[in-house]
């Protein structure tokens, strides 16, 4: 069987056949199409007609990209179930219940890639090393902090580190290896708001970086977020894991 199967302007029947083939053989599906998107879950949203890229992975991951920005405009996590019915691709997540439907108006192209990839990513770089340091010595954030997840997927992106504080509050850490700016604060706020929708108000957001701009500091104060100063550990400097943060800011 070919590694890559491409079908231009596929019919409804051809879309179903190729989706079934991809599911059977563990293929990655990429669809270029004009479509509408309907989401129902913790809230409801509608995305009007437009040209988009739809990606379906063997683990159930489902992503819809526009022609801008890095993040998908809509997505479902691994474990979701994908079906095709009456020219609509439907992805359902059971817990919590979320339903994402892509109504195909005009399919331009469908690609099935029978990819084989068994390697795991070996993370390197300052932010990954900052996360390692935090897991090795959570006190660099604060006494009683317990990190639980790293690179945790949520509705609006991927949280660098997520854990709980001594009072049982959820704590979201956004890590930056260089001076943090307004964008970093906005990103953290988006993650905190998303988790508050799911878990309630007991969610804290902490920006972790060597420093931050004056504008970022003001926005942190305005949004009720926090800052911890932490330098990225130098390679080979294992003693850094025992160093406690020098100062922190809590509005």
From Swiss-Prot:
Give the record's subunit note.
Answer: Homodimer. Interacts with PCNA.
Gene Ontology molecular-function annotations: DNA binding; identical protein binding; single-stranded DNA endodeoxyribonuclease activity
Q: Which CDD domains match?
A: NucS-like
The protein's matches in Pfam families, at most eight in alphabetical order, are given as: NucS_C, NucS_N
Could you read off the lineage of the organism from its UniProt record?
Answer: Archaea, Methanobacteriati, Methanobacteriota, Thermococci, Thermococcales
Per its record, how is this protein called by name? Endonuclease NucS
Purpose: Cleaves both 3' and 5' ssDNA extremities of branched DNA structures. Binds to ssDNA.
> Which of UniProt's keywords are assigned here?
Cytoplasm, DNA-binding, Endonuclease, Hydrolase, Nuclease
Gene symbol? nucS
NCBIfam families documented for this protein: PRK04247.1
**Which ranges are annotated Basic and acidic residues under compositional bias?**
230-240
